[in-house]
Design a protein with these regions (language model features):
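NUDIX/MutT-family hydrolases
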Residues: 180-214, 219-230
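N-terminal leader/linker segments that precede catalytic domains of diphosphate-processing enzymes
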Residues: 1-116, 120-138, 142-166, 171-175, ...
Length: 261
């Protein structure tokens, strides 16, 4: 593994360590790249919720189908896939939808120092919504009473932690005071969806490793998504969840799960 490299994204520095694959190819442009800049600005929370309903992703519509990647991971011999959930918490700040993110502690075993959505492993027989709300309360001090769960995004696989992750979208009332859990979360912050939709924010690479990854294409390549934000980098599973959220919010065809197929 290499350290943070300015040359990976020229002119952009970030504190995380991003692993080096055996082979890298350029990926596709952002699904929303063809949209006018005006269509990527002034996205409020109500618009995101409305789009979720239109795409059949409301809570009432039920869980979306499993991705081919997740099904492939579940078929791996001798591998136990751990069910998990994350909360895609949406705040409204001056009329703009923001998503709540965390920086994980550098002392953690998996995904140390990375930007993440609050969430974690399922406890007992609780469902994905209960898991996401509990984990957000434990990790960042978000009171479940201040969250209105409104929809689902596609469940995805985290190969690094052998997890099946169910993203739950929820709207947050007001401007909460965050309480990061020591030892798990270094800081809590939010990013405007409009900033993630900016022309220079998104990058896709296609990676190939010597050991085939479940869900890779016929040549062994799989997409890795990155969002460049000021002095930071969002990538991996979190970026994949955000790609689908932004695709739905902007009304474009295709989402993270479809791009994996």
């Amino acid at each position: 593994m290499s350290g943070a490299r300015a040359e990976r994204f020229p002119g952009h520095r970030y504190p995380q360590v991003v692993p080096e694959p055996d082979e890298v190819r350029p990926g596709a442009p952002a699904p929303w790249a063809h949209l006018e800049a005006s269509a990527r600005r002034s996205i409020d929370v109500a618009r995101v919720v409305r789009r979720l309903v239109e795409r059949g992703r409301s809570l009432e519509a039920g869980l979306p189908p499993l991705s081919q990647e997740l099904l492939a991971l579940a078929r791996e011999p001798g591998l136990t896939v751990r069910p998990s959930a994350v909360l895609v918490a949406l705040l409204e700040v001056e009329g703009e939808a923001h998503v709540v993110l965390t920086r994980r502690s550098r002392a953690l075993r998996h995904h140390r120092g990375e930007i993440a959505l609050p969430g974690g492993r399922r406890d007992g027989d609780e469902d994905a919504v209960a898991t996401a709300l509990r984990e957000a309360n434990e990790e960042i001090g978000l009171d479940p009473a201040h969250v209105s769960p409104v929809g689902w995004l596609s469940p995805i696989a985290s190969v690094a932690s052998n997890s099946a992750i169910w993203p739950v979208v929820g709207t947050v009332a007001g401007q909460p005071r965050w309480r990061p859990q020591p030892g798990e979360v270094e800081r809590v912050f939010s990013v405007a969806l409009a900033d993630l939709l900016a022309d220079d924010a998104f990058v896709e690479e296609r990676w190939r490793r010597a050991t085939p990854r479940p869900g890779a294409d016929d040549e062994g390549f799989f997409p890795i998504y990155f969002f460049r934000v000021p002095e930071d980098l969002i990538w991996g599973a979190t970026a994949r969840v955000l790609v689908e959220l932004l695709s739905i919010a902007t009304g474009v065809d295709g989402d993270a799960s479809e791009r994996l197929r």
